[in-house]
């Protein structure tokens, strides 16, 4: 029985989707004004892992993740580079797709762009005005936050404290235009030569919060199963999404709110962020390291907990991947000489370990405990491989289970390419040298192959090779 921690209720709840066998899932995507950093990638990876596990459990997942392609940051960045906002968006949407592909993040069912939904955004705001939840002032439109009785509930915010904070951090001119300091913008009037669209209130552009309300309800319906995002989005973004959406539809907006923890760096575990300047972009990092190692590191901690990023932890993730790949390679290597049949004791133990994996993951996607079972499955496989005689069905079963569970973490090992003619010739030459007991030459050829990234291993079952 799958349980998830619901931020709205601050407790674990049994997961029951609106439609049996199908999950509607919306995850806030990036504001595409720059390359994503590792902290941004953590959110994408965490919810991709959750999605993959739901699919493993037999659910069809309708997964929508948006692109925020117009807001203050977009305008500022476009002006700095002397290009248009759409040009900036196109550049970094392409970069995002390249980065997430390298991290083996499954493409979303839909990746809507805010600017493709302006007509729906305007209609949504008009509906809120008609219901007296919003009001227009000099081309801007604001939401009456206090009118929504549950405002502040998601993030546990007190309205009086919010009023004081809003008054301290909002420009005096804007505060005077608002009916209440905690009201927030749904539509922003055009300023200067900013990108803008026609609306009943004059030319302008949407506020950030309204974009996600419109896109999630448009593509997934008035009520969705799971809404995900980083913990920094709880307030005000997700709080405002609830207020907007439920005021318009009169329905529960989201049944389960899931929020991932931050990526931290340094001895003081400081949150990684662009504003603090302590970030590393995925684009730069994957030029230097195996993207799969970064993916595995980001997948190895339960999604609600913070993850510390460091080069040593990244190297540890790569070591763990190498060991798992070696296990799978060894299972494949023994297959041609395996006897027919199966070892029922080993098969039963493997089934128990996969069942324990499911139990762990069913507890709010507890990947740490899940990985413990996966490593035990790899250990069982290695112990079985030590036997002089192995059975083909058992090898296949072990490899299939390992591959299936690793895929939940986005780990898919590519088959080694065939050796080219030159390397094949060197291997034959080495075998001839060994037969002639010319071990110095044999070792020299081995070292030459190693320099080309080919590792030779002499085993009781014969010589085998693998790429370093």
From Swiss-Prot:
Q: Where does ATP bind?
A: 274
Q: Which cofactor does it need?
A: Zn(2+)
Keywords in UniProt for this one? Aminoacyl-tRNA synthetase, ATP-binding, Cytoplasm, Ligase, Metal-binding, Nucleotide-binding, Protein biosynthesis, Zinc
One MF annotation (Gene Ontology) recorded for this entry: zinc ion binding
Chief location: cytoplasm
Q: Where is it localised?
A: Cytoplasm
- The top EC class is ligase
Q: Kindly state the positions of the motif 'HIGH' region in this protein.
A: 30-40
Q: Does the keyword Protein biosynthesis apply?
A: yes
- Cofactor: binding comment: Binds 1 zinc ion per subunit.
Reaction equation(s) it catalyzes: tRNA(Cys) + L-cysteine + ATP = L-cysteinyl-tRNA(Cys) + AMP + diphosphate
Q: Which InterPro entries match?
A: Cys-tRNA-ligase, Cys-tRNA-synt_Ia_DALR, Cys-tRNA/MSH_ligase, CysS_C, Rossmann-like_a/b/a_fold, tRNA-synt_1_cat_dom, tRNAsynth_Ia_anticodon-bd
Q: What Enzyme Commission number(s) apply to this enzyme?
A: 6.1.1.16
Motif 'KMSKS' region: which residue numbers?
271-275
Q: Where does Zn(2+) bind?
A: 28, 212, 237, 241
One of the GO biological process terms: cysteinyl-tRNA aminoacylation
**What do the Gene Ontology cellular component annotations say?**
cytosol
Q: How does it assemble?
A: Monomer.
Q: Which HAMAP family match?
A: Cys_tRNA_synth (MF_00041)
The family classification in the record reads: Belongs to the class-I aminoacyl-tRNA synthetase family.
Q: What is this protein called?
A: Cysteine--tRNA ligase
Give the organism, scientific name.
Latilactobacillus sakei subsp. sakei (strain 23K)
Q: What is the lineage of its organism?
A: Bacteria, Bacillati, Bacillota, Bacilli, Lactobacillales
